[in-house]
Amino acid sequence: MTLVPIESFEHHIPEVHSSAFVHCAAHLIGQVQVGEEASIWPCAVLRADHGPIAIAARTSIQDGCVAHVTHDVSQTRIGMECTVGHRVVLHGCIVGDRCLVGMGSVLLDNAELGEWCFVAAGSLLTPNRKFPPRSFILGSPGRRVREVTAAEMEWITHSWKSYQDLARRYRRGS
């Protein structure tokens, strides 16, 4: 069995569902909750020392992501069946269910995504920006350029399911 780097902070210990996968090179600190069949990949850091971070069921937090919170200003909640791409920064934001956040994007304090949003790689969501469901978001600062298509919704579903399958393979030791 591989040990997972879980660190308590001021008596708060990360809670990881027994079916979740957390890579041994990830780091979870403080008030972190990881839901059923979620996956946290190498070099991801979820540092909940200023407030809670919640990762819902079947969501993947990919390599090099950083999640944090600004004390008394924001919270970080990621909905179910989301894909958070490599090197994304989640800083005090709320992501609805079935969203895809593209690689290298930055979501700042109190930014909110409705369900089925697609954030293009490298986008910057500035503080307090709120996006309705099915928004395709692009740029720096991020703006809604159109509605997410049915094909993109299929891709979002394919993405979280493929990471769920990969996590199962890692748990088996394949």
For every predicted segment, state its role.
Residues 18, 23-24, 29-30, 35-36, ...:
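Left-handed beta-helix
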Residues 2-15, 74-89, 97, 136-174:
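C-terminal segments of enzyme domains that contribute to small-molecule binding surfaces
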